[in-house]
Amino acid sequence: MRLMGLDVGSRTVGVAVSDPLGWTAQGLEIIRINEDKEQFGIARLKELVKQYEVTAFVLGLPKNMNNSIGPRAEKSQAYGELLKTTFGLPVDFIDERLTTVEASRMLIEEADASRKRQKQVIDKLAAQMILQNYLDAKGPLTKQ
């Protein structure tokens, strides 16, 4: 039983997956998308869902600082609906405010990553943080 965490942007989707017990999240990759052309990376997600035997999705919900839902959060919700329709799997959302900012800070301070390197990994790290925050809040997937 694994969860897939997604950080959905307008040009990329960061992807992370949990371990089978739901303790930790690992960043997998970044999928290029194009919202304007309605290219959402579903073919690649299908491969990953099958490969990792994913049972549910967790998407970051980028709320505004005043807790309201803005255009970017609405796009994330629409992406979640697309996933439900396509995969027939549950989709949950978690507040992701400042996740990308925190991921960037980590890359600079802890990994001393260049701006170019940050762009290559930041969405994957943000997806990992989104999923890890969700796992930490919900507890392990296999309760005894």
Swiss-Prot record:
Q: Which domain of life is it from?
A: Bacteria
What would be an example GO MF term here? Answer: nuclease activity
* Cited Gene3D superfamilies: YqgF/RNase H-like domain
Q: What is its subcellular localisation?
A: Cytoplasm
Keywords in alphabetical order, please: Cytoplasm, Hydrolase, Nuclease, Ribosome biogenesis
Q: What class of enzyme is it?
A: hydrolase
Q: Which Pfam families match?
A: RuvX (PF03652)
Q: What is its main location?
A: cytoplasm
Keyword Hydrolase listed: yes
Cite the InterPro entries for this sequence. RNaseH-like_sf, YqgF, YqgF/RNaseH-like_dom, YqgF/RNaseH-like_dom_sf
SUPFAM superfamilies reported for this sequence: Ribonuclease H-like
Q: What is its EC number?
A: 3.1.-.-
Q: Name one GO biological process term.
A: rRNA 5'-end processing
Q: Which GO terms describe its cellular component?
A: cytosol
Primary role:
Could be a nuclease involved in processing of the 5'-end of pre-16S rRNA.
Do you know which NCBIfam families this protein is assigned to? RNAse_H_YqgF
Q: Which family does it belong to?
A: Belongs to the YqgF nuclease family.
Q: What is this protein called?
A: Putative pre-16S rRNA nuclease
Query: What's the source species for this entry?
Result: Lacticaseibacillus paracasei (strain ATCC 334 / BCRC 17002 / CCUG 31169 / CIP 107868 / KCTC 3260 / NRRL B-441)
